[in-house]
Amino acid sequence: MLKPNMLIIIFIIVCLFSIIIFTVLKSKRGDDDESDDGFSCYNKPIGVNFPHPTRCDAFYMCVGLNQKLELICPEGFEFDPDVKNCVPISDYGCTANQN
């Protein structure tokens, strides 16, 4: 069993690591209340994928308070908002509807 002092040290390390990661992510993306494409993570759940407003092969994942990551599907795939993941391009999906 861990001693109380060891638990405090582990807690401090986890907190510092979290702060560093948050700072790095925030500096790479900047303040993110809304991007040029109009998508915002404001009042959206963290860890959920959302369709990109203009690209079939891209989606956003909200990763923090008003912070997002733009992710791209592999070649030959498109984002399906029903399953909230990348799926093979189909004759009835987003890509087909854009043509």
Swiss-Prot record:
Gene Ontology terms, MF aspect: chitin binding
Annotated S-S bridges: 73-86
One of the record's GO cellular component terms: extracellular region
Keyword Protease: no
Predominant subcellular localization, coarse grouping: host cell
Keywords assigned by UniProt, alphabetized: Disulfide bond, Host nucleus, Virion
Pfam families: CBM_14 (PF01607)
Transmembrane segments: none
Compartment(s): Host nucleus; Virion
Keyword check for Disulfide bond: yes
Protein origin, superkingdom: Viruses
Family matches, as SMART domains: ChtBD2 (SM00494)
Gene3D superfamilies named in the record: Chitin binding domain (2.170.140.10)
UniProt domain Chitin-binding type-2: residue ranges: 38-96
SUPFAM superfamilies for the chain: Invertebrate chitin-binding proteins
Role of this protein: Plays a role in primary oral infection of the host.
Name this polypeptide is given: Protein AC150
